[in-house]
Amino acid sequence: MATTTSVLTIGNGEISSDLIDPLDFSIARAPISALVGGDGTENARITTAIFAGESGAPRDAVVLNAAAAIAAYDGEFELNLHDRIAKGVEKAISAVDSGAARELLAQWVELSQQLSTPRV
């Protein structure tokens, strides 16, 4: 998020190279220092704050990374990479703002706790 990112895409037997800039998606660039987490407790606090609607560089990083994953998963390869990521940004913002991401995280936490409980 501090600068642009080079992305290689493989498809239809071809390799293409793109340059992704957060500014292309109305996401501000941020220094690496704004993205540094901490221990598990601190990272959980940051994640909870993001999913509760707190804005800032950590949320922007989550949105942009989720958008890239969505772009790869959705498979709309007839669109160029920038358009796929732009659609992913919209979906990621919607998931965070609607509470869907927070709800899914709560389900993962619950499942993780169930799986870590010793069975007798």
Annotated model-derived regions:
Residues 1-120:
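Glycine-rich anion-binding loops and their surrounding alpha/beta cores
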